[in-house]
Design a protein with these regions (language model features):
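The feature marks the mature, well-folded catalytic cores of soluble enzymes
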Residues: 2-304
Length: 304
């Protein structure tokens, strides 16, 4: 079921003392302790203790080097006992200097929030805490549209629908709730990513009928890039977008052509070790800069 929620009037005020970025800026966390040590999602099933930390680090370094060539990349120190900390985008949602911290439902990931909280405080971000009883998993389940003036949020697996109101209060923006109906797509970022220029990259099979109707209402047909099940199960939608460039894992030639025809350059990354843990390119980098700054660096696509 898809619903729209208007933010309440108790939105956080953004002060001039919060961090200001003039370049696209992201936070990444090296996979020093990464491993598939338990099962929290269907991707982990069958891969417990089958991931290679050396290969994961090489793949992470490849993405880090590529991203660093077009953006500033800050690093969060990895902590022992937090093998999923590399998926740093799940730990918060950031916009206008305000960081809405996650409230992880899985016990195995709860310690990550404290480490990110400490880093964000040191950098001057305002914190928007999430109640313990309100599961919310940051960029994993909530995404701004490309203008940064509205939110899309998922529920049904890891984030509860009540968290959507909480997120709306942080920035005083409307939120459209989407229901995830396929357990393989346990996070919104595995099946839905707004792109610059008013485009959406998504897998319709991950959502119920009402949610697909909401997406189709918001995005005209010529702005919807619906992916195949094959591409979806290779984390094609878990993509990082900077202006005219889309960073993603390995995708089919057909999808790459469709993105190119829409005006995007595609950078394909080898991220197989992270797919074993249920993540892709977007999961590995938490956006710190505001969307206008993030997209302007590589050119914002005009909407025609």
């Amino acid at each position: 079921m898809a619903t729209s929620i208007a933010a309440s009037s108790t939105a956080t005020n953004v002060f001039a003392s919060t961090p200001q970025f003039t370049r696209p800026t992201f936070l990444m966390c090296p996979p020093e302790w990464y491993g598939v040590d338990y099962v929290l999602n269907p991707w982990m099933a069958g891969n417990v203790h089958r991931s290679s930390r050396d290969l994961a680090f090489a793949q992470w370094k490849g993405m880090h080097n590529v991203l660093r060539s077009v953006a500033d990349v800050r690093l969060l120190h990895p902590e022992p006992g937090c093998p999923d900390m590399v998926f740093v985008a799940h730990s918060a949602l950031i916009h206008n200097g305000v960081a809405a911290l996650s409230s992880f439902n899985p016990q195995q990931r709860r310690a990550e929030t404290a480490y990110l909280r400490r880093w964000l405080i040191s950098q001057g971000f305002l914190l928007w805490e999430t109640p313990r009883e309100t599961p919310f998993e940051g960029e994993g389940d909530v995404a701004f549209n490309d203008d940064g003036n509205a939110l899309w949020a998922a529920h049904g697996v890891r984030t509860c629908r009540a968290a959507h109101r909480h997120v709306a209060d942080a920035w005083h923006v409307p939120v459209t709730s989407l229901h995830l109906s396929d357990p393989r797509f346990y996070h919104l970022d595995t099946c839905f990513t707004p792109l610059a220029g008013g485009y959406i990259l998504y897998y319709p099979g991950a959502f119920d009928a009402a949610s697909n109707a909401a997406i189709e209402h918001a995005y005209p047909a010529n702005r919807r890039i619906a992916v195949s099940e094959h591409d979806a199960t290779h984390m094609a939608c878990c993509a990082l977008n900077l202006g005219r460039t889309v960073f993603t894992g390995e995708i089919t030639r057909e999808l790459a052509t469709r993105l190119f025809d829409a005006g995007f350059d595609v950078v394909q990354l080898e991220l197989s070790e992270f797919i074993k843990g249920g993540g892709g390119a977007k999961s590995l980098a938490l956006r710190l800069s505001d969307l206008p700054v993030t997209h302007a660096r590589l050119g914002l696509l005009p909407v025609s």
